[in-house]
Design a protein with these regions (language model features):
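Conserved catalytic-core segment of NTP-binding enzymes
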Residues: 2-93, 99
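C-terminal alpha-helix
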Residues: 119-130
């Protein structure tokens, strides 16, 4: 994908494997924006912090971290402590997400007012406003 000739103004969204492997193989390639997704566990937050540090060197635009499945204040505090100074979107654990999946529906269609969908609603503007 990194070798493709992609027209200016084209949005490409890629979902890469977990971890930092893809980021370490970028070489001198710059990307327009990076979203790092993490759970609020110690190991996952550590990897997210390392991924963000590497991604910062390769992005010419925003770097946003999505902390997924946040259950409580302890999770929120762990995210804030580990990722201090980063742009973070906290997405709460939300039964509407697996419910929509079981119904073979997008959460945005099935439960547009659910806490997780509302938390993610501002992500696009964080990515394209720069």
């Amino acid at each position: 994908m990194l070798g493709l000739d992609i027209a200016e103004g084209t949005f490409v969204v890629a979902d890469f494997e977990a971890g930092i492997g893809t980021l370490t193989r970028l070489g001198d390639t710059k990307v327009d924006a990076v979203v790092v997704v993490t759970d609020p566990t110690v190991k996952s937050l550590e990897v997210a912090s390392r991924a963000a540090a590497i991604a910062q060197e390769h992005t010419s635009g925003p770097l946003v971290i999505v902390a997924n499945r946040v259950l409580d204040d302890a999770d929120r505090e762990a995210v804030e402590r580990t990722l201090s100074g980063r742009t973070v979107v906290l997405v709460p654990e939300d039964d509407a997400i697996p419910s929509a999946d079981r119904a073979d529906s997008a959460p945005l269609d099935a439960s547009p007012d659910s806490p997780a969908v509302l938390a993610l609603s501002g992500l696009a503007s964080l990515l394209v406003s720069h």
